[in-house]
Amino acid sequence: MASLAKNILQFRSKITGKLNTPDFRVYCYKNNKPISFFHDVPLTSDKDTFNMVTEIPRWTQAKCEISLTSPFHPIKQDLKNGKLRYVANSFPYHGFIWNYGALPQTWEDPNVIDSRTKMKGDGDPLDVCEIGGSIGYIGQIKQVKVLGALGLIDQGETDWKILAIDINDPRAKLLNDISDVQNLMPRLLPCTRDWFAIYKIPDGKPKNRFFFDGNYLPKSDALDIIAQCHQHWKVSRDRKQYIKNFHNESVNNVDLINKINSLKEEVSQNVSNYPSFPYFHTIPNL
């Protein structure tokens, strides 16, 4: 466990701007240089442990995500029609009901038809719902155990949701597959499916639909989905025509590195010293 912890302690966060503003950014640093959350954080810590980049802490509403179109792929708050995006509170839920994030070095290729769903990918890294009891923070790299997957249909595209638990959670040793989640946390799976079904309704969109009638896939399928999306990332990372700045040539751009290093830091701490819940904002008029 100590060696696993050491694997992620080599990464630090540099936060510029403030949450709830368009200038908010979280950069990933290694050896005092900015790196890419998407390309440079490894997918795994060992054969059974995956690295998850936390984008949205549990119970919060700001829609933050890794930006695939920005140099070094920082996390930023998403914009739509020039306005910052938030997820509405859909009764009885408050914000996101798990720590939500992405698996680095994975890509749901929009040019490839998924063998299970028969639909193309959504063009993003794989999403992760981390179901542990602790509340993460934006940019935190959590080491997680994969448990299963839920297939969401997003505007005619495949949008997998990987369910996982922080390996440091007390329940992690008891949860080894999606069936264990059903037995130990019986309300979590139906609530997760319900949340994804209704969360866009306050924005005037219809109820979301699922592949496989909303049934969860077991760990073995989830691991296979991850392996496929990791392969898509490997194959496509040099095809710059697919995603602007997808190829990580920016790591050698000295001027760009100096520009990012010169940005005013709001927070710059080792993850082990970071406050457990630094972002709690009451968002009005949702």
Curated annotation (Swiss-Prot):
Cofactor: Mg(2+)
Record's keyword terms, sorted: Cytoplasm, Hydrolase, Magnesium, Metal-binding
Catalytic activity, EC: 3.6.1.1
Broad class of the protein's primary localization: cytoplasm
Binding residues for Mg(2+) 2: D127
Cellular localization per UniProt: Cytoplasm
Reaction(s) catalysed (UniProt annotation): diphosphate + H2O = 2 phosphate + H(+)
GO molecular function, one term: inorganic diphosphate phosphatase activity
Entry keyword annotation includes Cytoplasm: yes
The protein, known as: Putative inorganic pyrophosphatase C3A12.02
Binding site for diphosphate: R85
GO cellular component terms given for this protein: mitochondrion
Biological source species: Schizosaccharomyces pombe (strain 972 / ATCC 24843) (Fission yeast)
Record-linked InterPro entries: Pyrophosphatase (IPR008162), Pyrophosphatase_sf (IPR036649)
Similarity remark: Belongs to the PPase family.
GO biological process, one term: phosphate-containing compound metabolic process
Binding site for Mg(2+) 1: D122, D127, D159
CDD domains on file: pyrophosphatase
Pfam families in the record: Pyrophosphatase (PF00719)
Domain of life, per lineage: Eukaryota
